[in-house]
Amino acid sequence: DRLSHAYLFSGPRGTGKTSTAKILAKSLNCINGPTPEPCNVCANCERINNGSSMDVLEIDAASNRGIDEIRELREAVKFAPVDGRYKVYIIDEVHMLSASAFNAFLKTLEEPPHHAIFILATTEKHKILPTILSRCQIYDFNRITVEDTVEHLSYVARQEGVHFEPEALNVIALKADGGMR
């Protein structure tokens, strides 16, 4: 029942790390929450779904890997949430941050404001500083099995009224290499 201030979601591409981060952000900020299952219809959930929430910020570390961006984050984190209970910072591809950016970010992870939650996502956990890892609750995501991928593709096709050959779904699932994208 205790909430961590920092999570690290690690695993291959397409295994749901960023999607899970957004679901967690909705669970924390849903008007009916905090709840294990966000409603997806309240104003907070809708804003998170369409990317317009002032309380959930997604940062692509592959594009914003420098110390200046992390300094901006350190300043922004001081401000309380606008609509929800928490400000959630989702930092995708966090392993791409420069060493100086990691060190600047460490200070924020060591003394986070009570309203800030950090969700770091990576495909390369081994590139993240041990001092960062030690401050995160770590969740390892695994490749999705071919069977589960076929089952999901079949479900989506039926929902959309699309005819399919089961063998074709199996080929697609094999080519997906454990990712659901």
Sequence positions of predicted segments:
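Helix-loop-helix "sensor" segment of P-loop NTPases
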Residues: 139, 146-170
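The conserved phosphate-sensing helix
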Residues: 165, 176-181
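P-loop/Walker A NTP-binding region and its immediately flanking N-terminal helices
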Residues: 1-138, 148, 156
